[in-house]
């Protein structure tokens, strides 16, 4: 891709844990660089996390990240505007975002299938909501995951299964993941995917990187499952630095920041 033909970045969608969060000085560096951008012209800032929406907003305050314009929570199953931001005023009612998840989905059935398996452990209630069933499953083989998919299908469910970090298993409605939620938001905002940059570190970020035309930043501490995506892909930048410093490095590469 010829750099000069790329459109300016209009939106940053970043994961939190292991990406913008995980190294306090790096997080602070990102915050100062972001806040130095002209508020009228800087990209829309979206935090796209497996955490639930309220938890994201509390966590952002806790670690000192800049306030987001929007949050996508629950691995693409929740969408919210932040607290006290006038930028939300022009945004249409968010409730219709979740209406698309109902078909083929039953939380009770999902929980029954996963709860019947011997190696799965239900994650705490703080990680669960109406369209996200989250479990711990250590070092699952592809065969074990395929077996779970079959069991869910046999129960009449139409779901997306996301396994990341060799531990975290999220069962979501078929039309839910971080990438699809981001694409929906961009469409509502009138922002093209070729004006978007995404950042992440694990497999549950993969769907963001797969959006056609979107640019990416894979931080140096990313798991192999995501690092492999960046090979031979000119739209995905592999940072040499980890955590938020890697995001800063990537934003220099994509011309959002002038320097690191």
Where are these regions (language model features)?
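Conserved acidic, metal-coordinating active-site core of Asp-based
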Residues: 108-199, 203-212
